[in-house]
């Protein structure tokens, strides 16, 4: 299986780095999406991709903008809205490729999980299977995962700063606008 890296532009003109693994005897197509602050080569994202590759599915992985991968943007500006738009833009680009086929599979971790679920709600005819893994399901429920003081401090300072678990030594600084955007979404 050949691995190819391409750079496409999203609707905002930002570069999105995409990894293509096209199966020689393609039985289907899968888009695999990372979570907040993730990237396309994270070990668990590679495991998701391998499950499809082992079954002769071509796999498209990409770094959303505003993450720690190779695509444009800054992590502090990350939102569900921008991750979702990047997913739509990657799929729209893929529609013009010779290996594209519908319906396709979608797999996503955490924030990627809510994005693929939102896509499936909007375009159910395009989706054969959906695999949201440890998915965000509701902005409102997200606020219940930590105590009120945590979010009060975040809102007051405008940022949440913490060390990355996927890239040790890297500090993640995320704007409060991430929460404001997250509250717009609810799969329940």
Locate each region found by the language model.
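The alpha/beta-hydrolase serine catalytic core
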Residues: 114, 126-188
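Alpha/beta-hydrolase active-site loop
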Residues: 77-98
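Short beta-strand element of the alpha/beta-hydrolase
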Residues: 27-35
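Conserved alpha/beta-hydrolase
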Residues: 45, 49-72
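Alpha/beta-hydrolase fold nucleophile elbow
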Residues: 98-109
């Amino acid at each position: 299986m050949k691995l190819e890296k391409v750079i496409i532009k999203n609707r905002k003109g930002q570069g999105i780095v995409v990894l293509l693994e096209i199966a020689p005897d393609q039985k289907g197509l899968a888009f695999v999406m990372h979570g907040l602050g993730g990237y396309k080569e994270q070990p668990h994202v590679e495991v998701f991709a391998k499950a499809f590759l082992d079954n002769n599915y071509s796999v498209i992985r990409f770094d959303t903008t505003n993450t720690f991968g190779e695509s444009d943007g800054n992590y502090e500006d990350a939102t569900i809205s921008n991750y979702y738009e990047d997913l739509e833009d990657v799929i729209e680009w893929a529609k013009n490729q010779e290996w594209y086929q519908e319906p396709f599979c979608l797999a996503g971790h955490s924030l990627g999980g809510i994005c693929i679920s939102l896509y499936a709600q909007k375009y159910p005819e395009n989706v054969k299977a959906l695999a949201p893994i440890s998915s965000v399901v509701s902005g409102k429920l997200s606020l219940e995962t930590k105590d009120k003081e945590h979010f009060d401090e975040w809102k007051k300072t405008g940022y949440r700063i913490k060390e990355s678990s996927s890239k040790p030594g890297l500090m993640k600084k995320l704007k409060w606008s991430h929460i404001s955007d997250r509250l717009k979404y609810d799969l329940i």
